């Protein structure tokens, strides 16, 4: 039987991998987006684990909202990256510093 602490350990490892990825690799925007998604997966794992072990469905409902926001984030982020690569030829973070509002 898998206990709550096992889920929390897994979630904290995934969260730490996402944080390390953000701090170590600051040059590629796609990698930064993937690390943000890892952090969201860790949060979703916590919500589902607590929801299961506490016996209510509120955490699972929150997961659906988080997944919806994450899907919108990825769609908008990849659209911006596609346009950035088409116009500038690179998706480096240094190139995005010169974006105009």
Swiss-Prot record:
Keyword vocabulary terms for this entry: Cell inner membrane, Cell membrane, Membrane, NAD, Quinone, Translocase, Transmembrane, Transmembrane helix, Transport, Ubiquinone
Membrane topology: Multi-pass membrane protein
Cellular component aspect of the GO annotation: NADH dehydrogenase complex; plasma membrane
Reactions catalysed according to its record: a quinone + NADH + 5 H(+)(in) = a quinol + NAD(+) + 4 H(+)(out)
GO terms of biological process kind: ATP synthesis coupled electron transport
Recorded superkingdom: Bacteria
Subcellular location: Cell inner membrane
Record bears the keyword Protein biosynthesis: no
Membrane-spanning ranges: 4-24, 29-49, 61-81
GO molecular function, one term: quinone binding
EC numbers, comma separated: 7.1.1.-
Keyword Calcium: no
HAMAP family with a match to the protein in the record: NDH1_NuoK
Subunit structure: NDH-1 is composed of 14 different subunits. Subunits NuoA, H, J, K, L, M, N constitute the membrane sector of the complex.
Similarity comment text for this entry: Belongs to the complex I subunit 4L family.
Role of this protein: NDH-1 shuttles electrons from NADH, via FMN and iron-sulfur (Fe-S) centers, to quinones in the respiratory chain. The immediate electron acceptor for the enzyme in this species is believed to be ubiquinone. Couples the redox reaction to proton translocation (for every two electrons transferred, four hydrogen ions are translocated across the cytoplasmic membrane), and thus conserves the redox energy in a proton gradient.
Protein name: NADH-quinone oxidoreductase subunit K
Organism: Ruthia magnifica subsp. Calyptogena magnifica
